[in-house]
Amino acid sequence: MEYRELGKTGLKVPVLSYGASSLGGVFHSIKESEAIQSVFTAVEHGLNFIDVSPYYGHYKAETVLGKALKELPRESFILSTKVGRYGKDGVNTWDYSGKRAQESVYESMERLNIDHIDLINVHDVEFSDMNQVVNET
């Protein structure tokens, strides 16, 4: 696997990443055991940059991914998640406040069974007030 430096972060990430939206059943249903095994296979083959969001499957993707990550050494993967877009029971919500972003980070860490997140992205900024994102989120 080819790796590249990610800006000035000091992180070296693979040129391909593992997008975990499917773990939340976003595109179709998936057996949890197969979802977890797909994470193990990806990391084993060098796809160790994993991207997820609380919005994917309305928290399910992070929850399933967390079951896989607790079985892996923390240094074996780089993790990215998002703040700003949430939803449950088919209701989409956006909240770009600093307070909600901070709460979301801690909630994600709990679901993901980790003690830190390597990268945090702001999800779907086109629905936001950019001044709030820049100055608060």
What are these regions (language model features)?
Residues 1-77, 115:
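N-terminal binding-site loop/beta-alpha segment at the start of enzyme catalytic domains
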